[in-house]
Every structure is written in C-alpha cells, then in structure tokens.
Regions:
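Surface-exposed, proline-anchored Ser/Thr-rich loop/turn motifs
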Residues: 46-47, 431-463, 473-478, 505, ...
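Terminal connector regions
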Residues: 102, 106-148, 405-427
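Beta-strand-rich N-terminal accessory domains
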Residues: 138-225, 261-263, 284-285, 299, ...
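Extended, loop-rich substrate-binding clefts of extracytoplasmic carbohydrate-active enzymes
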Residues: 197-270, 378-380
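Glycine-rich (often Gly-Gly/Gly-Pro-rich) flexible segments and glycine-rich loop motifs
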Residues: 281-379
C-alpha cells in the first residue's frame, strides 16, 4: 500500500475461486461514481486547518444490497486528513440503482500541508459486514493556483508565472483558458524575463520539452480579491528568480484583472511589476509571455498572426471557424516584440519547440521586434512582449498585457481596446496603440557588445526586399571593414556569419544599411 497508494484496496491475496465467481447468482459489487468536496468557506479551495464535507454518488452494480454503508480511511501519504465523520448509511439498493449520499463524510486538513498536494482517501462500501466495493477518491489541496471566472474569458493563473495550468505537461491542476464554457484553448502559458540568452528566467518548457523551466520561486501565494475592480475580481501573487542559476536579479508582483462589464466581458488584464533586486543596473531588460495555443480538438490547423493595425497577436483554427479567435497584446509604453511559432519548425529563424525550447531560442523570439508575423497552419504558439528598458537597483517597471477572445476578430479588437482604456482608468502602465512603421534593424550580435577579432553571427531584420550592407565603422563614421553584402535580401529575419576585423582595441559601431534606412549598434573590440 505504501508503494502503490493509487491501488490501495485493489490488490488481493490468496487464491481466486473462479468457478464460484461466475456461478453465483448473488455476487455483490458497488462503485463510487463520483465524489464532491465542499470546503467550509465554500470558495472551492481546501486549505490547511479547514474542514470539508464529502458527498458520494454510489451505484450498486450487481446483486441487491440490504443495508449498504460507506466508510473512509486515509492511505499512505505525506500527510493524513483528520477524519471527523467516517461515513454513514446508504440503505438497501437494487441492482443497477444509483444513490446520492450527501455530506456523508467530514474531514479536515492538518495545519501543515504541502503546496498542491493530493488528498487521497479510500472509500469502502459495506453490506452486512462485507466489503462490496472500494474506490480511491482524490482532490487537490492547498493549491497555489486560482481560476478567474467572473466573465466570458475564464483563466487559471498560478503563483510562479504560468497561465492556464500549474503542472505542465500533465495540465491537471487548473482549468486552462476557456471562452463562454468552451473546451480549453491554451496548452501552456509562461512568463519570460531576460537581458541576454544566458540571463533569461522563465517558466516555459525547456531543453527537455516534457519539463518546464522553474526559474521563479513563490514568495506570495496567489489570492483573489474584489477590491479595486468594479464588477469583477483581481488576483495578486509574487515570485522571485533568486534561486535560479540563470537569475537576472528580479522579483515580480503580478496582478490580474477581470470584470463583467459588457465591453470587457471577453478580456483579462495581466500586469507584471518587475523589480531589480541586484546591486547593479540591469540594461536591455525584456519581458514576454509565451503561449502554446490549442484552438480546436487537437491543436492542429492553428494560424498565429500579427495584426499590425491593432497591435494584437491573434490565433484561430482555420479549418474550424466555429472555434473562438484569441488575441494577446502588450499594452505598455515599451517597444513591442512578436514571434509566430510553428511548433514543428526546424530552421534557425523558425526553430520550433517540439525538440527543445532553448534559452537562445526564447531570447530570439522575445527580443527581435515584430519578427515572424505569421505561422503555418499547424500546431502553433506565439511570443509577445516588450523591451528593452533599464532598471536601476531597487527600481520597478510595470509591463501589462491584455488577453481577449471572441467569435470574430472584431470582438477581440474591441475587447482589447476596452482593456487598454480600463487599464488607464486603473492607473496601470499603458498607452493607446499607434501603428508603427516597421524598420530594418540589427537584432542581435552574438557575444556583443564586447567582441574579439574572429567569427561571430549577426541577426538582423528587414521589412522589404532590398540590398543590405553591414560594416564596422569607427567613431568618425569611417568604414573599417565590410562584413556582409547582399543585393536582394528578402523581408524577415536573417543570420549572417561575419569576421570581426583585427584592429586596434577600442569602441566601434556595427552599421546596417538598406536602400532606405540605417541602423547602428555600438561594440567594443578587444584584443
């Protein structure tokens, strides 16, 4: 029983009298079809020290029972419930009869219970002194996740930066994201914060895609509150990267807002107050959300796209238009970044996430501007965020996102526009969206800004077919070395392998020139 608590009461001993089992016309067996737990605070959260009443639905499967009763006991586990009322009488039951046994069991939790623990209890059905049925019933207790369900867009959030579910990839803890009672729309939602590929903390899947990165440690368990949100609720939680080996040096206080007002019934706001806990200024800070959407029965035929007019990343099932459209927008006054992901991608600039999801890939997606604007029709994800910005020691910066769903693109756009306005009313860090022209730019210099002579890679984006020249220039704008030339590069992201010249150590610029634009990035060459 200790090694297999899920099978307590199911393993027998001794010999099986097979003939008697099939020959008897009075074989008895009953089943527990369902069990419901009602905690005394009636908030759906079974917490340490709290009492709960358990109701059972019992079915008699075989021969009639004359005076059935139920009783419960603990099974081997890290903690034991305090059983205050062990069971009660159900009575006579005919073959095939189903009966409700309300509040038949009362248990309470001890004062010390692990987070997100499973309370497992063995229910035994007894008739005339003989056990005629056994069933293990379970519920999650002392949970660190909550579901906001006051409007049409219901969403679970946890206490360490995930949206949708707490326990990727099992996804048994939480309700995901649903619209008007739909099936779940989100497989994975995760916060990512970084200043460089090697300084990136997150709770998305990682090098092993069956496990998520666990950069954030809970410092305040998520709580639901009704203050500050007219006709709605908000959730508050906090967490820190202090224990992560890739730590940036931040803690986060997250606020989620949900209201039932007509114009906001299809949206949720999620804001992140990011504070620098280190003793040095953090530069190049980026904050992003990763979403692996599953719109439809199997998550296929999803297309993620960028709506440049409204500043919204959208996803829809192109084969099943009856399913909702979902949108996400970064609504704070920092530069927006967006990347549409083919989950089965395999190229440098469309790396995919089936084989792994490395920090370098996460950084590419969260810091490359409006980079990949549409996915294929496949199992698709998106990364949307904002940056760069700097944080002095102890300084806090808020980055907010609006998530919306609807039957049409128009409903999503209207909901997110209303969310921007409500965010402003609530005093959150937001701004009105103004479509910005896309510009060609240097996205990333491998190893930069301090470089040594030799090979490195430069990632750059261009927004129309154009010739491209990348060179090294000195402080007076004089060309020191030409690194890359192309006559007709296509729009999108490009990665060029270049050789940094052997020159006197000092400060220089890498310059990108197209037919209409110029961009520069400062570097230091050391020898």
């Amino acid at each position: 029983d200790t090694l297999n608590p899920f099978a307590v009461g199911r393993f027998g001993t001794g010999r099986v009298d097979a003939y008697a089992a099939v020959a008897s016309s009075m074989t008895t067996w009953a089943s527990v079809l369902s069990a419901s737990f009602k905690d005394e605070s009636d908030d759906g959260l079974f917490t340490p020290g709290e009492r709960a009443r358990i109701s059972l639905t019992v079915r008699n499967d075989l021969a009639p029972l004359t005076n059935a009763t139920v009783r419960v006991r603990n099974v081997p586990a890290p903690f034991a419930a305090i059983i205050e009322q062990q069971g009660g009488t159900i009575g006579a039951m005919g073959q095939g009869e189903t009966r409700e046994a309300r509040d038949v069991i009362v248990v309470s939790l001890p004062d010390e219970v692990p987070f997100n623990a499973s309370l497992d209890l063995l229910v035994e059905i007894i008739d005339n002194g003989r056990i005629v049925g056994r069933e293990l019933i379970s519920t999650n207790v002392n949970t660190t996740y909550r579901t906001l369900d006051r409007n049409d867009l219901a969403m679970t959030a946890n206490s360490s930066g995930n949206l949708g579910f707490n326990d990727y990839p099992d996804n048994a803890q939480g309700d995901g994201v649903t619209y008007r009672g739909s099936r779940n729309l989100l497989f994975e939602g995760a916060l990512m914060i970084g200043t460089a590929p090697g300084k990136l903390v997150n709770v998305a899947r990682g090098a092993d895609t069956d496990q998520k990165d666990t950069a954030f440690s809970t410092t305040g368990v998520i709580a639901l509150r009704t203050d500050s949100v007219p006709s709605g609720i908000r959730a508050v939680t906090s967490y820190s990267d202090a224990l992560d080996p890739y730590r940036v040096g931040v803690d986060v206080r997250q606020h989620l807002y949900q209201t039932a007002d007509d114009s906001l019934r299809n949206v949720v706001l999620s804001c992140y107050d990011v504070r620098n806990t280190s003793d040095t200024t953090l530069s190049n800070v980026h904050v992003a959300l990763f979403f692996d959407w599953d719109i439809g029965p199997n998550g296929q035929q999803n297309v993620v796209s960028w709506d440049a007019q409204h500043g919204i990343g959208r996803v829809r099932n192109v084969a099943r238009p009856e399913f909702p459209v979902v949108g996400a927008a970064m609504i704070s006054p920092v530069v927006t970044h967006f990347f549409a992901v083919d989950n089965d991608g395999f190229t440098t600039l469309n790396p995919g996430i089936y084989d792994n999801f490395l920090r370098g890939e996460k950084w590419l997606m969260m810091s490359s501007g409006i980079a990949r604007t549409q996915s294929a029709a496949t199992d698709a994800s998106m990364v949307i965020g904002g940056g760069p910005f700097a944080l002095a020691p102890g300084e806090t910066r808020q980055v907010c996102f609006a998530l919306g769903a609807g039957d049409t693109d128009s409903l999503v756009s209207k909901g997110i526009a209303a969310a921007r306005n409500r965010a402003r009313t609530l005093g959150l860090n937001t701004q009105t969206f103004e479509p910005a022209p896309r510009t060609s730019r240097i996205v990333h210099i491998e190893g930069g800004p301090t470089l040594t002579p030799g090979s490195t890679t430069i990632t750059f984006s261009i927004h129309f077919i154009t010739g491209v020249i990348i060179d090294v220039v000195d402080l007076f704008g004089r060309t020191v070395s030409e690194l890359y030339t192309a006559r007709d590069d296509a729009p999108g992201l490009h990665v060029a392998t270049v050789n940094i010249p052997t020159v006197s150590g000092g400060n220089y610029f890498i310059r990108l020139r197209t037919a209409t634009t110029t961009d520069v990035a400062p570097i230091a060459i050391v020898r």
